[in-house]
């Protein structure tokens, strides 16, 4: 099994898709990486040679973009900073509500968690 940046790449997927399993790499960046390293996007990750794997690893580490742990730490630090300075987005993060202006009268169940039933008015 091919292991890259601390992530096990799925064996049966094409490299173009398999690279997207690394946090911080999407389809566009995956194509860019494969083009720069000369690895075929149609190659399955199980058929990847050690030389190809080394080329991919070196290119990702040498590139300016952050992936995996570094990117996760940066995102968490940004959220922590917003909470500390007390901006609106920080307050929304602290309360566990949607941050980007979505409605909350209905929906937002993923962010708010399961419904808390409130007793109805008795007649």
UniProtKB/Swiss-Prot annotation:
The lineage's top-level taxon is Bacteria
By its UniProt entry, which Gene3D superfamilies does this protein fall under? Answer: 1.10.8.50, 30s ribosomal protein s13, domain 2
Q: Which UniProt keywords apply?
A: Ribonucleoprotein, Ribosomal protein, RNA-binding, rRNA-binding, tRNA-binding
Q: Where are the transmembrane segments?
A: none
GO annotations of cellular component type = cytosol; small ribosomal subunit
Among the GO biological process terms of this entry, one is:
translation
Q: Which GO MF terms are attached to this record?
A: rRNA binding; structural constituent of ribosome; tRNA binding
Disordered: annotated segments? 96-123
Q: What does the sequence similarity comment in the record state about its family? A: Belongs to the universal ribosomal protein uS13 family.
Subunit composition and interactions: Part of the 30S ribosomal subunit. Forms a loose heterodimer with protein S19. Forms two bridges to the 50S subunit in the 70S ribosome.
Task: Name the HAMAP family for this protein.
Answer: Ribosomal_uS13
Function according to Swiss-Prot or TrEMBL: Located at the top of the head of the 30S subunit, it contacts several helices of the 16S rRNA. In the 70S ribosome it contacts the 23S rRNA (bridge B1a) and protein L5 of the 50S subunit (bridge B1b), connecting the 2 subunits; these bridges are implicated in subunit movement. Contacts the tRNAs in the A and P-sites.
NCBIfam families named among the record's database cross-references: uS13_bact
From the Swiss-Prot or TrEMBL record, give the protein name.
Small ribosomal subunit protein uS13
Q: Which organism is it from?
A: Nocardia farcinica (strain IFM 10152)
Q: What is the lineage of its organism?
A: Bacteria, Bacillati, Actinomycetota, Actinomycetes, Mycobacteriales
């Amino acid at each position: 099994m091919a292991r890259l940046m601390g992530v096990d790449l799925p064996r049966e997927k094409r490299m173009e898709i398999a690279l997207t399993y690394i946090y911080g790499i999407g389809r566009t960046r995956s194509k860019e990486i494969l083009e720069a390293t000369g690895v075929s996007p149609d190659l399955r990750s199980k058929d990847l040679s050690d030389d190809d794997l080394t080329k991919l690893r070196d290119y990702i580490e040498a590139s300016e973009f952050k992936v995996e742990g570094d990117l996760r730490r940066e995102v968490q630090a940004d959220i922590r900073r917003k909470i500390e300075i007390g901006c609106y987005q920080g307050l929304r993060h602290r309360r566990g509500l949607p941050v980007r202006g979505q409605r909350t009268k209905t929906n937002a169940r993923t962010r708010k968690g399961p419904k808390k039933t409130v007793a109805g008015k008795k007649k």
